[in-house]
Amino acid sequence: MSDYPSCALRLEQVARRYRSGDQELVVLDHADLELRPGEIVALVAPSGTGKSTLLHLAGLLEKPDEGRVWIGSHDAGGLSDTARTALRRDHLGFVYQFHHLLGEFSALENVVLPQMIAGRTRRQAEQHALTLLSAFGLQHRASHLPGMLSGGEQQRVAIARALANGPAVLLADEPTGNLDIHTAETVFSALLSAVRNQNVAALIATHNPDLAGRMDRQVTIREGQIVPA
């Protein structure tokens, strides 16, 4: 493994186990993974092999039983819950299969809110949100509520929201899994363009081999190890 300053995300000898009755299920067994700044990696693990667990560990939503998770030069091990939340807010972005937009807020407001939580003024946040929405071709939909948007538009707003605070790492779990083929292609192309333009490292789970093939490399989970796909 490389020294951490050169990595946007680093999982070092990470182990995660769960108990089911009297049995212990080993999901990750001292596994390693690193993403360099701007690197886009496809996670193509089948369902049930630990894909969600890996994303949760990388996103600081779960703690490993053993090993360390680094976000840039920050070691997440031993941090308080408050410090982990701040690290996640300031350095990570998340995109899910379902957009999880706040239905009572407009597209613009959904992208503004995380910025204001991070400390930007409303004016700064709105200007940046409009820039992001414009990059996704949504400037004319900024005032619309999520329910007034198409599925593809909703997901593009969700991606803009994930990138609003300038994360070092984007974690995406089947970001096009709920879309038809044509819309999925449009959304995925927009996602790739955005992360490349911002030099964001990305770990993107997908079952679509065509989309996976457009990323820099592919990994899977096999017998508790993260290995090339």
UniProtKB/Swiss-Prot annotation:
GO CC, alphabetical: plasma membrane
One Gene Ontology MF term: transmembrane transporter activity
Membrane topology note: Peripheral membrane protein
InterPro entries the record matches: AAA+_ATPase (IPR003593), ABC_transporter-like_ATP-bd (IPR003439), ABC_transporter-like_CS (IPR017871), ABC_transpr_LolD-like (IPR015854), MacB-like_ATP-bd (IPR017911), P-loop_NTPase (IPR027417)
Keyword list, A-Z: ATP-binding, Cell inner membrane, Cell membrane, Membrane, Nucleotide-binding, Translocase, Transport
Residues that, per the record, bind ATP: A45, P46, S47, G48, T49, G50, K51, S52
Annotated EC: 7.6.2.-
PROSITE patterns: ABC_TRANSPORTER_1, ABC_TRANSPORTER_2, LOLD
GO term, biological process aspect, one: lipoprotein localization to outer membrane
Main location: membrane
CDD domains assigned: ABC_MJ0796_LolCDE_FtsE
ABC transporter domain segment(s): 9-229
Compartments (UniProt record): Cell inner membrane
Protein role: Part of the ABC transporter complex LolCDE involved in the translocation of mature outer membrane-directed lipoproteins, from the inner membrane to the periplasmic chaperone, LolA. Responsible for the formation of the LolA-lipoprotein complex in an ATP-dependent manner.
Complex and partners: The complex is composed of two ATP-binding proteins (LolD) and two transmembrane proteins (LolC and LolE).
Record-stated family: Belongs to the ABC transporter superfamily. Lipoprotein translocase (TC 3.A.1.125) family.
PANTHER family: IMPORT ATP-BINDING PROTEIN, LIPOPROTEIN-RELEASING SYSTEM ATP-BINDING PROTEIN LOLD
Protein name per the record: Lipoprotein-releasing system ATP-binding protein LolD
Lineage of producing organism: Bacteria, Pseudomonadati, Pseudomonadota, Alphaproteobacteria, Acetobacterales
